[in-house]
């Protein structure tokens, strides 16, 4: 058997490159003749190599890098009739898919060692068709003014909710959040109206938080569709705080939350709506999203995968608490229901 490690040499201060010998050893001991390819700044470098490696018969492709590298590798193999197994070694900032799979995110060698358990499953892949362009994603798609703002920030903050925490600190950007007209068709109905954004989720982890689509499954053939209908700034911040405070947004009347296998989204007029795929610009609507059920086999410890999140992500608690305090201060509202309106500035001063 042969394995091809496709890695981003610049991810995490070149951490993959520094651990490459040990990573090779893990896969060699698992029975794979292993080689590597370092991605280049050229567009679609990882995608092209993944497609090439699959076509010449590699049995396993290892995507080592951030979510962008993993997305490229998936795009390289998802359209093929014969697809190799996929493994991921997270070396980026958010590492959403590794988080959803419960793959170690702070130790690359331990992430590689997941293969030693000899476990895998077939994961769903999202297909997005825009005009004549076909793309794939494995975590999140979306559109609307809020997702478009993510293109203006540094790459490490490009995830939607990571960016929210960023621009609440920079209040000058908040007035830019405005609803736009949307027409969204899904399995059980049609949404027609103004919305700040819509999200098409395959996993429960978005921007490092696991409560946005808490009941998302990785292999059920369904997207989680989330449409944020609110256009009021205070309501919007309250809604985000609910997301971060234990997934309390699911019953919010300003949210459409449903499961669907296919989505068609477009602006009802000639206006432009950019589409975000796994945190990057993917093209312009109209777009058709299709869930490709159990499309790619991925190496993962199936014993450890938490199919539905029933508690807050402990790793994000500090960020969530700080965000909620910021929102409470800006809106003068008790967001978390503890009977107090907190101020992060006040607490910083006291400390």
Task: Please give the residue ranges for each predicted region.
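Calcium-binding acidic motifs and repeat modules
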Residues: 314-351
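Short Gly/Thr/Asp-enriched flexible loops that form oxyanion-binding sites at enzyme active sites
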Residues: 68-84
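Gly/Ser/Thr-rich active-site loops/lids in small-molecule metabolic enzymes
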Residues: 157-165, 214-235
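Glycine-rich phosphate/pyrophosphate-binding beta-alpha loops
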Residues: 142, 146, 199-212, 281
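ATP/nucleoside-binding phosphotransfer catalytic cores, i.e., glycine-rich phosphate-binding loops
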Residues: 186-187, 192, 217, 227-315
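Glycine-rich beta-strand-to-loop/alpha-helix junction loops that act as flexible
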Residues: 9, 64-66, 89-91
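ATP/NTP phosphate-donor binding region
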Residues: 1-61
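Catalytic core of DAGKc-family lipid kinases
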Residues: 30, 37, 79-196, 200
């Amino acid at each position: 058997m042969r394995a091809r490690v496709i890695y981003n040499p610049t991810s995490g201060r070149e951490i993959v490159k520094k651990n490459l010998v040990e990573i090779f050893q893990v896969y060699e001991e698992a029975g794979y003749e292993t080689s590597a390819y370092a991605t280049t700044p050229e567009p679609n470098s990882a995608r092209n190599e993944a497609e090439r490696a699959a076509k010449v018969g590699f049995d396993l492709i290892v995507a080592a890098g951030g979510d962008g590298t993993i997305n490229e590798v998936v795009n390289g193999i998802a359209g093929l009739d014969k697809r190799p197994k996929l493994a991921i070694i997270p070396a980026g900032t958010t590492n959403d898919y590794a988080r959803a799979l419960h793959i170690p995110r702070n130790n690359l060698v331990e992430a590689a060692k997941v293969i030693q358990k000899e476990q895998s499953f077939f994961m769903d892949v999202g297909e997005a068709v825009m005009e004549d362009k076909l793309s794939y994603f494995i975590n999140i798609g979306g559109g609307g003014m809020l997702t478009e703002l993510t293109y203006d920030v540094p790459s490490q903050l490009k995830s939607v909710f990571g960016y929210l925490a960023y621009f609440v600190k920079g209040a000058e950007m908040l007035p830019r959040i405005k609803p736009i007209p949307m027409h969204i068709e899904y399995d059980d109905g049609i949404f027609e109206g103004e919305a700040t954004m819509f999200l098409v989720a395959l996993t429960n982890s978005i921007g490092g938080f696991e409560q946005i689509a808490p009941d998302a499954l990785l292999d059920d053939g369904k997207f989680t569709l989330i449409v944020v209908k609110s256009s009021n700034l205070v309501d919007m911040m309250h809604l985000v705080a609910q997301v971060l405070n234990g997934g309390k947004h699911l019953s919010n009347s300003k949210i459409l939350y449903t499961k669907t296998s296919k989505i068609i989204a477009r602006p009802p007029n000639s206006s432009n709506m950019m589409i975000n795929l796994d945190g990057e610009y993917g093209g312009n609507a109209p777009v058709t999203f299709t869930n490709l059920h159990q499309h790619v086999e991925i190496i993962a410890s199936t014993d450890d995968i938490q199919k539905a999140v029933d508690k807050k992500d402990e790793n994000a608690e500090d960020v969530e608490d700080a965000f909620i305090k910021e929102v409470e201060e800006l809106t003068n509202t008790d967001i978390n229901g503890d009977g107090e309106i907190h101020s992060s500035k006040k607490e910083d001063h006291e400390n």
